[in-house]
């Protein structure tokens, strides 16, 4: 069914830029600002700027890496001054052997296999646990992380991964259900972007057709 479309008009009124091709995993404060200024210096208008994977120290620890971003608040303020709307890349994965992983495993908020063991998914960036977005408590946990980022000045989020194939085939809950739950969480943000969704036609989501 068609959902109430609440997408931010800025996703369509101006270009959407992404730092991935320029910086890949080497996202830094200097690199992001240099990229944004180069956009303007080359006669292009400001628009939505997505800071891609590599801005945090690990997956699930959704805080700016202080080694790469020594003053994230100042960077966000400068990007806004230049006319950009800023989105951050996130994913449902949790890096194993981190404080976040141990906390989420102890509280039962990670995806498990049929035997009840925390599932470790093999995805394009290696091996990670997966946040169980079918649980309201897991959604609340992630929302708190994103609330903190928005309080700093982040405007929205690029919700990557969430593909059905990255969830266990022997889980009680199907991969399609998990993928749809990831999309449902992201839909609450008017500034969202997805690479892939499942069963979310007519939802208030921006999904790209392909990488360019």
Task: Label each region the model flagged.
Residues 1-212:
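Catalytic-domain carbohydrate-binding cleft regions of carbohydrate-active enzymes
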């Amino acid at each position: 069914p068609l959902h109430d479309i609440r997408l931010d008009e800025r996703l369509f009124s101006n270009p959407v830029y992404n730092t991935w091709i320029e910086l890949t995993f080497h996202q830094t404060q200097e690199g992001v600002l240099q990229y944004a200024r180069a956009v303007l210096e080359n006669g292009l208008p400001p628009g939505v700027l997505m800071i891609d994977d590599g801005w945090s120290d690990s997956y699930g620890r959704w805080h700016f890496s202080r080694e790469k971003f020594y003053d994230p608040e100042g960077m966000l303020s400068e990007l806004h001054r230049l006319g950009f709307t800023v989105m951050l890349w996130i994913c449902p994965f949790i890096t194993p052997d981190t404080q976040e992983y141990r906390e989420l495993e102890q509280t039962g908020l990670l995806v498990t296999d049929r035997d009840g063991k925390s599932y470790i998914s093999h995805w394009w960036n290696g091996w990670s646990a997966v946040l169980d977005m079918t649980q309201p408590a897991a959604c609340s946990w992630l929302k708190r992380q994103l609330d903190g980022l928005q309080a700093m000045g982040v405007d929205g989020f690029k919700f990557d991964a969430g593909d059905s194939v990255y969830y266990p085939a022997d889980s009680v809950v199907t991969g399609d259900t998990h993928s749809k739950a990831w999309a449902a969480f992201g839909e609450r943000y008017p500034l969202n972007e997805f690479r892939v969704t499942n069963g979310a036609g007519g939802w208030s989501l921006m999904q790209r057709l392909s990488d360019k």
